Amino acid sequence: MSPTDNQHTHTDIQHMTDIDLTGVFPAMTTPFTPDGRIDYDILAQNAQRLETAGVSGLVPAGSTGESATLTHDEHIDVIETVIDSVNDVPVIAGSGSNSTREALNLSERAADAGADALLLISPYYNIPEQAGLKDHYRTIADAIDIPQIVYNVPGRTGTNIEPETVATLASHRNIVGYKAASGDVGQISSVVEQTRSEAFSVLSGDDILTLPICGLGGSGVISVGANIEPAQTTAMVGAAVSGDYDRARNLHYQLAPLFEHLFVETNPIPVKAAMEYRDYGPGTLRPPLTDLSDKHRKRLESILDDLDADREMALAGQTEVI
């Protein structure tokens, strides 16, 4: 039975007026049963597992959570389930849309459910101009008084949010961060430089670029890989933001094969397969996404086995604990 069926309410929850965006924020998967229904019990278990591993927050109902194939009610149910399942970590709810009105509605519902912050993907398919992007984000930020993160992923949306646009939006008191998934390190560097005077955080949206982005002044990552290796990813980012780049590099190189392979096919296809291999839940995807190819699955399982072997050696005192 879904949270809506149980009539959960969150009227007693006070929204956070601030949020620390330092560290690792897993972009959570949404587990589905073989017939395509959401498995809320496994979703709750994964939220608790990630909190126990020491992550800084959780991000349900985003791209990795297959938000594009969730109904609006399912979208909110997923967010509520994660909120109800954890104790202390903030929940950053994915609530973007290509329609400003729809994004505003989803964001209001997420805030009412008790989300601590919002992650807002830029409008996709309709390809707005920079002025339209500014209006879109300001409309939501003016209406909803909780922290909001601008999410730039032009490979999915068809629109790039220019650094100057981000810098303008950063002056709004409710727009507190930027998820960088353009793959353009030069552009990300420009965003960091132009927002340094603001109370504003730049987060990697691409695991393999997390270390260089932290080196530029970024504060962490909204991570796919942390669904699989939360403690190790947290250790890497912690080392990077504290300036221990030797340790951060070592951890990066250990995790890099996983980070790269999780995007060998469309996200979240590989991470769903990895979740299943680690017994973190079913690998079921909603159409039109399809299962990971046998070739890529075999390589993924080899990478996961290598990480497990490294961990066993570390526990035996033969290598550095990762």
Sequence positions of predicted segments:
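Terminal disorder- and signal-encoded targeting elements
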Residues: 1-18, 318-322
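Active-site beta->alpha loop and helix N-cap motifs at the rims of alpha/beta catalytic domains
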Residues: 15-157, 314-315
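A general structural signal for well-ordered alpha-helical segments in protein cores
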Residues: 25, 43, 75, 79, ...
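Structured C-terminal cap/extension of enzyme domains
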Residues: 38, 214-322
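Short, amphipathic alpha-helical "lid/cap" segments that border enzyme active or binding sites
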Residues: 43-47, 163, 297-304
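Alpha-helical structural signal in soluble globular domains
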Residues: 53, 77, 81-85, 109, ...
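Glycine-rich phosphate-binding "P-loop"
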Residues: 152, 175, 287
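Catalytic alpha/beta core domains of metabolic enzymes, predominantly
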Residues: 156-254, 259
